[in-house]
Amino acid sequence: MTVIRKKHPLIKIINHSFIDLPTPSNISSWWNFGSLLGLCLIVQILTGLFLAMHYTSDTTTAFSSVAHICRDVNYGWLIRYMHANGASMFFICLFLHVGRGVYYGSYNMIETWNMGIILLFAVMATAFMGYVLPWGQMSFWGATVITNLLSAIPYIGTTLVEWIWGGFSVDKATLTRFFAFHFILPFIITALVLVHLLFLHETGSNNPTGLNSDADKIPFHPYYTMKDFLGALILLMALMILTLFFPDILGDPDNYTPANPLNTPPHIKPEWYFLFAYAILRSIPNKLGGVLALILSILILALMPLLHTSKQRTLTFRPITQTMYWILVADLLILTWIGGQPVEYPFIIIGQTASIAYFTIIVILMPMAGTIENNILDLD
């Protein structure tokens, strides 16, 4: 077996990636989320595949085909809700994974980090298009509002929006192409994940101290395979509790009403995992400014390596920047709450304040804190 594992051209790649991979001996449970994201992706592809067997991407039958899946297909309700709530679990793991990367300075592995940002955009695009497919009220109006933002692009905006719609409004052509893209993107994401892992294995994993761990590494199997297996069990248990006991808690009641272009819902809002970005978008009165702020809210992650001023890699031994980090986390929670509120006083001003705070903490306060800590510790 050892000979096959180390000599076979295909198996030796798996061996170097998941079995004999030298891994720091001190990585904590925060390093579990990479494998959990892989599990989420597998769950989403499998459940999505079975849903696609029964779904029809036509405006007249899309809504009823989802109802048919839940009512008439064997365990269709389970597959549908596992897919919907699986997306929420996916984003919880994603946010924790990115948060870990920011806290422990993993952004210094620039290729891996940039690949991760591309993956984040790809997953967000996939989730957005997936939300349109049931063709409920929030599906239709969410698609209309978000795609319409592209009309803010000077000169080509309106043409671009109509090109994406495949007509003069969100209609059959839009739904069909969104289904096609929603189906193909997870496979593209899988390929990007392999590139992400390729870059990661070039440098090796970071660790909570941020120090070079070459002198103290252990094989990935059995230590971290068992650790990841435990994480996977906890994730699947959480997903099943969510799916079986609270299937609709993260959804919108409006999406149980079939799409009606003549009736606008009182509050158009995306799924919970986009609310922080939606709040930043809404906090700017200008349409183009809002779109730019929306894109920058994610793209700012790419500036992290440039904004790193500290001589230490992680925040483990940096209390001032730690404080800034947790204020940033609280700020993101406030933005998520605001994104789901109506556009009226006092939510408008809270959203604007939280949006300014978000960019200020990342661009100004955290780099300043790093410099102050260098001076306190006399690290020239």
Curated annotation (Swiss-Prot):
PANTHER family: CYTOCHROME B (PTHR19271:SF16)
Assembly information from the UniProt record: The cytochrome bc1 complex contains 11 subunits: 3 respiratory subunits (MT-CYB, CYC1 and UQCRFS1), 2 core proteins (UQCRC1 and UQCRC2) and 6 low-molecular weight proteins (UQCRH/QCR6, UQCRB/QCR7, UQCRQ/QCR8, UQCR10/QCR9, UQCR11/QCR10 and a cleavage product of UQCRFS1). This cytochrome bc1 complex then forms a dimer.
Binding site for heme b b566: H97, H196
Molecular function terms from GO: metal ion binding; ubiquinol-cytochrome-c reductase activity
Keyword Iron on entry: yes
Function (record text): Component of the ubiquinol-cytochrome c reductase complex (complex III or cytochrome b-c1 complex) that is part of the mitochondrial respiratory chain. The b-c1 complex mediates electron transfer from ubiquinol to cytochrome c. Contributes to the generation of a proton gradient across the mitochondrial membrane that is then used for ATP synthesis.
Entries under CDD domains matching the protein: cytochrome_b_C, Cytochrome_b_N
Chain residues that bind a ubiquinone: H201
Primary location group: mitochondrion
A single BP term in Gene Ontology: mitochondrial electron transport, ubiquinol to cytochrome c
Species assigned in the record: Microtus xanthognathus
Binding site for heme b b562: H83, H182
Membrane topology: Multi-pass membrane protein
Localization: Mitochondrion inner membrane
Cofactor(s) named in the record: heme b
Gene3D superfamilies (UniProt xref): Cytochrome Bc1 Complex, Chain C (1.20.810.10)
Residues annotated as transmembrane: 33-53, 77-98, 113-133, 178-198, 226-246, 288-308, 320-340, 347-367
Keyword check for NADP: no
Family assignment from sequence similarity: Belongs to the cytochrome b family.
CC cofactor note: Binds 2 heme b groups non-covalently.
Protein name: Cytochrome b
Cellular component annotations (GO), alphabetically ordered: mitochondrial inner membrane; respiratory chain complex III
